């Protein structure tokens, strides 16, 4: 198993990341997706990443558009807008939406996912 390699944290992500001394290869952000939280979460997550580490963002909707047919109400704007704003402010953070997965995702016969991978660059 991966019990000794994976740590799930339930709680205030920003506070956890501010207070941990650990470094991680992967940080999965899937909590409060509000813009103001994302604006604090992403920089804190970058601070606790190992070199070449990655951030996995959930509910990242490029251009704030729905990913699935008939799901116009299912768009969470905070992660996308927050990342765009951080990049405009000079944060060197590249994000690539995962797009389609080889398996069905949220809706039957759909392979689109709202996951995106982010990395720091120099």
Question: Residues of each region from the PLM?
Answer:
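S-adenosylmethionine/decaboxylated-SAM
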Residues: 1-122
């Amino acid at each position: 198993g991966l019990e000794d390699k994976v740590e799930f944290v339930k709680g205030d992500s920003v506070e956890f990341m501010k207070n941990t001394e650990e470094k991680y290869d992967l940080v999965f952000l899937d909590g409060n997706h509000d813009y103001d939280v994302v604006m604090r979460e992403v920089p804190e997550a970058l601070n606790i990443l190992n070199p070449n580490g990655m951030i996995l963002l959930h509910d990242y909707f490029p251009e704030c558009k729905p990913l699935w047919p008939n799901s116009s109400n299912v768009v969470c704007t905070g992660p996308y807008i927050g990342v765009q704003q951080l990049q405009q402010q000079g944060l060197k953070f590249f994000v690539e939406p995962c797009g389609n997965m080889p398996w069905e995702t949220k809706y039957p016969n759909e392979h689109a996912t709202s996951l995106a991978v982010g990395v720091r660059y120099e």
